[in-house]
Amino acid sequence: MGGRETLDPDPCAATIEAIRESCPDLPISLTTGLWITRSSERRLELIERWSVLPDFCSVNFSEDGTNELCDLLLNRGVGIEAGLSSVADARALIDSGYVGQCLRILIEVEPGTKDPIRAAAAICRVLEGAGVRLPRLQHGMGEQAWPLLEDAIVHGYDVRIGFEDTLTLPDGSPANDNAELVAAALRLAKAPSRS
């Protein structure tokens, strides 16, 4: 696919099967981002044709067709991770009626947000106000990646880090690979001030 994201059944199946063979106990998630197909109808058509299913999918509650997508995934036995990038997304999730069917909340503040920590906290306040107690994973992209990861550690949320999120280490130097990013995240999580 030349490095492009896809929801096409064959490459998705091949990827999931390869990961399961290599790491059989690793839960596998796929994104369902609308930017991949640019059409909510096309996205549904492709996912309906999946022959090998991930354990769960990330569903962005800012996108059109979210309810239909959640219905399809749940009917196929695929879990939902609710992707929230704003307070409006948090409210959309709460209003959707899918909160109780989600596995986790994915807080991913939009790149370029002036105060990403405050934006993430605002999303969390909406969730807490509605009694949403699902596990949370919080991450950011680019220069927001490390501050949001550290904030997630402080709050006891799950984290993720990789080249999809940032190409640099906390000190701003280039990372050689994903393993170096993960090692840096582990050092932050184990820092004495975090104990």
Which residues fall in each region the model found?
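Histidine-centered divalent-metal-coordination microenvironment in nucleic-acid enzymes
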Residues: 1-2, 31, 152
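Expand to "…catalyze enediolate/carbanion chemistry for C-C bond making/breaking, isomerization
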Residues: 186, 190-192
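Glycine-rich, proline-tolerant flexible connector loops at the mouths of alpha/beta enzymes
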Residues: 1-15, 168-170
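Catalytic alpha/beta core domains of metabolic enzymes, predominantly
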Residues: 58-164, 169-184
